[in-house]
Curated annotation (Swiss-Prot):
InterPro entries for this protein: HMG_CoA_Rdtase, HMG_CoA_Rdtase_cat_sf, HMG_CoA_Rdtase_CS, HMG_CoA_Rdtase_eu_arc, HMG_CoA_Rdtase_N, HMG_CoA_Rdtase_NAD(P)-bd_sf, HMG_CoA_Rdtase_sub-bd_dom_sf
GN (gene name): HMG1
Organism ancestry: Eukaryota, Viridiplantae, Streptophyta, Embryophyta, Tracheophyta
Example GO biological process: coenzyme A metabolic process
Protein name per the record: 3-hydroxy-3-methylglutaryl-coenzyme A reductase 1
Tissue specificity comment: Expressed in flower primordia and anthers.
Organism: Solanum tuberosum (Potato)
């Protein structure tokens, strides 16, 4: 095959080949489908378009007349037969002509791409043949040296990945050496591996958080013999987490963020960010948001706003413990205790104190408002101030711990289910009958019955504590991860009871969620990270509200409850309609074998 006959190849003339200079690339047009037409392209296209629409209109009119006159459709006249032949011919032309052009564009592009990556042997062959007709035609006999052509370098479109070599079970993968490490970094890595330099001290010694994380990651790979190639390191501001979010970082985990909504809540629309790896979750919540939206929206009420902390103290006798209980619960002493509690923060305000006795041990529960912060650190500082004051009044009081688990933080507890912790919210909506049928694909009566037997009776049979719902924790966890909340507080924040009732003569559905302990904040912790801060900004609750302290956190709590309402509504409908397994098989199945 003569490679010089290809249309878009940059060739070398005898003159330029001797100088090693390529000619400009010659543009040779590829053959087109229109080249085979006897008439100009625009006339041919117009003819067949006119034929197509004309015969289509004629046939439709004729068939309508046959239907009106009760004439069988298979009885055709000569004119109808010619019209059908013309219709078929025009369809074949239009599909074939434009189809050929469409496919040919890819074929020509493929030929061009394959030409760009042609091996150098064919190119060298052309140069040698052309050079025989130039000044150095007798190069082989006269010793004339023909300079080789410049080598064209083609930049790769994507970075090449190193080939993966299969290892036997007895072999260990060699640690990955990061190319960005300098000789000084290599010495530090060896020091960390040998145990001479503590890994936790790298940030303070180096003064560079990114460099410290890079060195720590490489040292970890060498110590364990395990690769962390899939754990990204670049693209994160490690100085932003120093001393507040994470210690000894070696990278960051990527979690996809989806958007459910718009959620129409209290007359406003919200696009709810959800960080999750569970397929169907965002789609299901989004369907619930749609059902709420077209039904007029949902309404929410904030019932309570107060974070709690309950230290445990011990006396020598139960009588002395009871005396302190009566003292702190006396309304006459509340002002004094409030002054002690509130002095550590301009946002923390003591709301109330309740005590519980277990023998000679006393558990004192402090409740306070915390502004736009979630407030655990804030309330802990206030509690410490009060304990210091009480210890001066009761010298025999022994402080066992600033947290006695009577709070109760990050654990399911009846006290939070009954009394509440953080923000207590109820959210409700009335879903119209036609929405239940068209959007949720089920019936009002079926939803009410399922909710009774599943969320209420079934949960009671299981001895559930705060778990009288379908999957509130799914939505709470996803929103918490996206907005920088403490994911461990999903435990009590997901306490929820879902209620469904037929209203308006049994036609419409009243659905509500009551969540007594939603613990959220818009300042502090993970809320200051760039990604989480962006999600808070999307909801309009980023940072502290200077005009009305605490209003951003309260609004975020109602958005969480509204999102849970949407998620409950959609999942219960899927179960009622028998669509749960089908949807999860479609959207929530892993098709990648990570063991390979």
């Amino acid at each position: 095959m003569d490679v010089r006959r290809r249309p878009v190849k940059p060739l070398y003339t005898s003159k330029d080949a001797s100088a090693g200079e390529p000619l400009k690339q010659q543009e040779v047009s590829s053959p087109k489908a229109s080249d085979a037409l006897p008439l100009p392209l625009y006339l041919t296209n117009g003819l067949f378009f006119t034929m197509f629409f004309s015969v289509m209109y004629f046939l439709l009119v004729r068939w309508r007349e046959k239907i009106r006159n009760s004439i069988p459709l298979h009885v055709v006249t000569l004119s109808e037969l010619l019209a059908m032949v013309s219709l078929i011919a025009s369809v074949i032309y239009l599909l074939g002509f434009f189809g050929i052009g469409f496919v040919q564009s890819f074929v020509s592009r493929s030929n061009s791409d394959s030409w760009d990556i042609e091996d150098e042997n064919a190119e060298q062959l052309i140069i040698e043949e052309d050079s025989r007709r130039g000044p150095c035609a007798a190069a082989t006999t006269l010793g004339c040296v023909v300079p080789p052509p410049p080598v064209r370098k083609i930049a790769p479109m994507v970075p090449q990945q190193p080939a993966k070599v299969a290892l036997s079970q007895t072999e260990k993968p060699s640690p990955i050496i990061m190319p960005a490490l300098s000789e000084d970094d290599e010495e530090i890595i060896q020091s960390v591996v040998q145990g001479k330099t503590p890994s936790y001290s790298l940030e303070s010694k180096l003064g560079d958080c990114m460099r410290a994380a890079s060195i720590r990651k490489e040292a970890l790979q060498r110590i364990t013999g395990k690769s962390l190639e899939g754990l990204p390191l670049e693209g994160f501001d490690y100085s932003s987490i120093l001393g507040q979010c994470c210690e000894m970082p070696v990278g960051y985990v990527q979690i996809p963020v989806g958007i459910a909504g718009p959620l129409l809540l209290d007359g406003r629309e919200y696009s709810v960010p959800m960080a999750t790896t569970e397929g169907c979750l965002v789609a299901s919540t989004n369907r619930g948001c749609k059902a709420i939206f077209v039904s007029g929206g949902a309404d929410s009420v904030l019932l309570r706003d107060g974070m709690t902390r309950a230290p445990v103290v011990r006396f020598t006798t139960a009588k002395r413990a009871a005396e302190l209980k009566f003292f702190v619960e006396d309304p006459l002493n509340f002002e004094t205790l409030s002054l002690m509690f509130n002095k550590s923060s301009r946002f923390a305000r003591l709301q109330g104190i309740q005590c519980a006795i277990a023998g000679k041990n006393l558990y004192i529960t402090f409740s306070c408002s915390t502004g736009d912060a979630m407030g655990m650190n804030m309330v802990s500082k206030g509690v410490q101030n009060v304990l210091d004051y009480l210890q001066s009044e009761y010298p025999d009081m022994d402080v066992i711990g600033i947290s006695g688990n009577f709070c109760s933080d990050k654990k399911p507890a009846a006290v939070n289910w009954i009394e509440g912790r953080g923000k207590s919210v109820v959210c409700e909506a009335i879903i119209k009958e036609e929405v239940v049928k068209k959007v949720l694909k089920t019936e009002v009566a079926a939803l009410v019955e399922l909710n009774m037997l599943k969320n209420l009776t079934g949960s009671a049979m299981a001895g559930a504590l705060g778990g009288f719902n379908a999957h509130a924790s799914n939505i709470v966890s996803a929103v918490y991860l996206a907005t920088g909340q403490d994911p461990a507080q999903n435990v009590e924040s997901s306490h929820c009871i879902t209620m469904m009732e037929a209203v308006n003569d049994g036609k419409d559905l009243h659905v509500s969620v009551t969540m007594p302990s939603i613990e959220v904040g818009t300042v502090g912790g993970g809320t200051q990270l760039a990604s989480q801060s962006a999600c808070l900004n999307l909801l309009g609750v980023k940072g502290a509200n200077r005009d009305a302290p605490g209003s951003n956190a309260r609004l975020l709590a109602t958005i969480v409850a509204g999102s849970v309402l949407a998620g409950e509504l959609s999942l219960m409908s899927a179960i009622s309609a028998g669509q749960l397994v089908k949807s999860h098989m479609k959207y929530n199945r892993s098709i990648k074998d990570i063991s390979k």
